[in-house]
Design a protein with these regions (language model features):
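Structural signature of extracellular appendage/secretion-system components
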Residues: 1-570
Length: 570
């Protein structure tokens, strides 16, 4: 009977082991559609048993000694790295493709076409300088350029603001993930102490969170002996066992823009990220968007200055009777080229000529005005410049309370300027075409809007003279010191080409990252994924084993009955 007892133990162990194996297979099948699930399998091991009457020891049955969770740590680490690169390249491409779409090149409404139309308008004005319609057309074409510059700048600012919001949202989610991982660490250690398999669902959840976190930022994971993990961003720990340092977002003002930065909540230290969606969004904002904003402002600044420089040295169908500069100085006694003066545009050592004409007689006098900025002796300030101009007969000059040059002709006189080698007229906004200093503030001078006759198409002030309009017409292709010695149209084309090239590079990087990630996902699926075909085979195997064990029990019951009958008949 003792031997039958051992046989019963073998049967009981088989029923228990294969019942558990069937349950594991069922769990795998139930989670076949769960992308975060890692396949489980039981480890069946033979039990030792006593010796039979024949002198052999067949064993004591079978035991499900452990539960294996099929995860390759190396593949998971590479998968997290590829997820970070993939999310980062996608974010970069999204930003650049939006900028590329914003510029809307190869259409009739892109900036390059509008700039060409604007400068061509001056060519048409040169051919018919006395025609008001041609003058109004130039002003309309200028408004088209201005509208596009403003719209593009506003769109870039909105995009930068949207990226800031995305960084805040991403950092908030990363903080939630880090907190949950710290909590899961503690739960996993507790569940592991209960026995094999208790922590498997928690580990699945933790691995899924790590993959999500890796999309936001590049992380390194180190598992501790107790099953908990530490998470690092760069060389800084983010999660250590059951403690998360936390993440926060701080706002910094730089280049006139509000920028969100990600920091550790405990010491406010900067979180150094090299890949991932957050790193890409921050980099795209700071390099691409801010860079494009600066380039757009530089383009507008160059356009304003170069057109104003030429326009201020020409004459319209009528001269000025009074004029107030559009740009003010901070200090009227400071040299015009000094930081204290605070002018936005350059002024050089040179001269310009003022022309004063009697409207009745046509008699014109000219005076050369010195702009002494050679750094020797007393350099020209706005105040001293006004004094020089005030010395011209029938011309009154002064400085307004807010630091702008103001000129008025005597009764019956008009004036204009020519041959300005100093750039002072353009820098002070005297006789200019544009106002403003960047893509946000650029506009057509209100004096031209009020009277298109003041558009300076002439150099001499004589009828049918369109020479200055011709000078304005070729500005689009002439190099400008304010545009890194490129022409206005070349500078704009290079801006667009830079974005297009960066977008193409980002698209290639995205495709490469997608390919690598897909390959690693396939590897993970082969290791951790559930195959219904394999599980069906396992289920059949375990089912038959269980049935055989049950049949084995039936046989043991029959033998037991026969033994008892033999004993009772004696």
């Amino acid at each position: 009977m003792a031997l039958l007892g051992a046989s019963f133990q073998i049967g009981r162990s088989a029923l228990a082991a294969y019942q558990s194996a069937i349950a594991i297979t069922g769990q795998n099948i139930a989670n076949v559609g769960n992308p975060n699930y890692a396949r489980l399998s039981g480890r069946l091991t033979a039990l030792e048993g006593g010796m039979t009457l024949s002198g052999i020891a067949p064993g004591g049955g079978v035991n499900l000694s452990g539960l294996q969770r099929h995860v390759d740590a190396a593949v998971e680490a590479r998968l997290r790295m590829s997820a970070s690169l993939r999310a980062g390249s996608q974010a970069t491409y999204d930003v650049l493709s939006q900028v590329e779409s914003l510029y809307n090149e190869l259409s009739n409404y892109d900036l390059s076409t509008q700039l060409s139309t604007f400068f061509n308008g001056f060519s048409e004005l040169q051919n018919d300088p006395d025609e008001i319609t041609a003058r109004n057309l130039v002003l309309d074409q200028a408004d088209a350029v201005i509208g596009t510059l403003r719209r593009q700048r506003a769109a870039l600012l909105r995009q930068a603001t949207d990226l800031d919001a995305a960084v805040r949202e991403g950092a908030q989610r990363a903080n939630q993930i880090a907190t949950e991982i710290a909590s899961l660490n503690e739960e996993i250690v507790t569940q592991d102490a209960r026995g094999p398999g208790f922590s498997a669902p928690l580990r699945d959840r933790r691995d899924a969170l790590l993959r999500e976190l890796s999309e936001l930022m590049d992380i390194q994971v180190r598992e501790r002996d107790n099953g908990a993990i530490n998470v690092y961003v760069g060389s800084e720990p983010l999660v250590e066992f059951n403690h998360s340092r936390g993440l926060e977002v701080q706002t910094e003002l730089s280049d006139g823009l509000s920028r969100a930065t990600v920091r550790f909540a405990d010491n406010h230290g900067t979180v150094v990220m090299s890949t991932g969606r957050l790193a890409a969004q921050i980099q795209a904002r700071d390099e691409h968007l801010v860079g494009q904003l600066q380039s757009l402002d530089q383009l507008a600044r160059g356009l304003i200055y170069e057109v104003n420089r030429v326009h201020s040295t020409g004459c319209g169908l009528v001269g000025y009777t009074n004029i107030t500069g559009t740009y003010a100085v901070n200090n009227r006694q400071a040299a015009l080229n000094s930081a204290a003066a605070g002018l936005d545009f350059p002024v050089n050592n040179g001269t310009f000529i003022v022309h004063l004409r009697n409207r009745s007689s046509g008699e014109t006098i000219t005076r050369q005005i010195e702009v002494d900025l050679d750094g020797i002796g007393t350099d020209t300030s706005l105040e001293s410049l006004a004094q020089q101009l005030d010395g011209v007969p029938n011309l009154t000059a002064g400085v307004t309370a807010d630091g702008r040059l103001q000129l008025s002709a005597g009764s019956g006189y008009e004036f204009w300027f020519s041959e300005d080698s100093s750039g002072a007229l353009a820098a002070l906004g005297v006789g200019t075409f544009f106002t403003g200093t960047d893509a946000a503030s650029i506009d057509v001078n209100s004096t031209l809007r009020s009277d298109a006759r003041l558009l300076a198409a002439s150099l001499t002030g004589e009828a049918a003279d369109g020479e200055n309009a011709g000078r304005l017409a070729i500005l689009g292709t002439q190099s400008s010191a304010l545009l890194s010695n490129q022409g206005i149209q070349d500078f704009q084309a290079r801006m667009v080409n830079t974005v297009a090239s960066a977008a193409a590079t980002a698209a290639t990087a995205q495709e490469a990252a997608d390919a690598v990630h897909s390959g690693l996902m396939a590897q993970r699926e082969a290791i951790s994924g559930v195959s219904l075909d394999e599980e069906a085979i396992n289920l059949t195997t375990y089912e038959r084993a269980y049935q055989a064990a049950a049949r084995y029990f039936d046989i043991l019951n029959i033998l037991s009955t026969e033994v008892l009958n033999l004993v009772s008949t004696r």
